[in-house]
UniProtKB/Swiss-Prot annotation:
Keyword DNA-binding annotated: no
A GO term from the CC aspect: chloroplast
Taxonomic path: Eukaryota, Viridiplantae, Streptophyta, Embryophyta, Tracheophyta
The protein's name: DNA-directed RNA polymerase subunit alpha
Keywords: Chloroplast, DNA-directed RNA polymerase, Nucleotidyltransferase, Plastid, Transcription, Transferase
Enzyme Commission number, as recorded: 2.7.7.6
Subunit architecture: In plastids the minimal PEP RNA polymerase catalytic core is composed of four subunits: alpha, beta, beta', and beta''. When a (nuclear-encoded) sigma factor is associated with the core the holoenzyme is formed, which can initiate transcription.
Known role: DNA-dependent RNA polymerase catalyzes the transcription of DNA into RNA using the four ribonucleoside triphosphates as substrates.
Enzyme class: transferase
Enzymatic reactions: RNA(n) + a ribonucleoside 5'-triphosphate = RNA(n+1) + diphosphate
Amino acid sequence: MVREEVAGSTQTLQWKCVESRVDSKRLYYGRFILSPLRKGQADTVGIALRRALLGEIEGTCITRAKFGSVPHEYSTIAGIEESVQEILLNLKEIVLRSNLYGVRDASICVKGPRYITAQDIILPPSVEIVDRAQPIANLTEPIDFCIDLQIKRDRGYQTELRKNYQDGSYPIDAVSMPVRNVNYSIFSCGNGNEKHEILFLEIWTNGSLTPKEALYEASRNLIDLFLPFLHAEEEGTSFEENKNRFTPPLFTFQKRLTNLKKNKKGIPLNCIFIDQLELTSRTYNCLKRANIHTLLDLLSKTEEDLLRIDSFRMEDRKHIWDTLEKHLPIDLLKNKLSF
């Protein structure tokens, strides 16, 4: 049982996980409540969380398979019970768990006769199979069977354009949706002016993350969406044309790293973690997903590298620039690292 208290402006909200169970390796269930909410608030929170849970949570999927010289996806391969299309559909159903960024390679290489399951996939270290018994194909004859795979972390439903795949490489329409279903219901209680609402939220996931983890990530994504409005007043945001247009200076991370090394040899930039740089949660999470953990990792990236990060925006770039302007002077580094 989990209980958290969040102080609101006029009320104290409480949330609980009232039920949690594992129905199978690929089906987790969690039931949560949030209360007390004023009339109408439960519906607002329920709609927002449901949309965020179903559309904003990232998942890892197999997005491409290369069989070799196979003319089309409806072909059959001698010694294999399933057609190429059936194998692609089975690969589409494989549930993976990871925190990888970008595209990774995987493969299957076995010799028949035997059943091929998810446990036969050779994966990079950052990827884990949720259900190793998921079927892929049945080899009925003593043949060598090898497939090259691509794995990607994304969100939502990704449809690949069908082209002429003469090299035997076929795209897989990936469903990067770890949350399988979300329901919410509202219960009203109290009398008169004391009347309030209780929100019940049910979450089913595919096993790549728990319902509690999904709820945390969805809530974090919603907070990130509203952060610009929270900072609008303090930044003096105006809708007047061109008033606050940001023209970024040349992003010279590598040049700054060179200058730092010239001024002070042996500065352990790998010991300065990005959580010390007072970044916003959104910027911090983008960098962490790209495996940028230290100041050295950050300084070694070019502007193009950063802009290729999923969900990384120009606002994040500006924020990083301003933060580095604040923290990169040598005397400040000396004070922080106690040289």
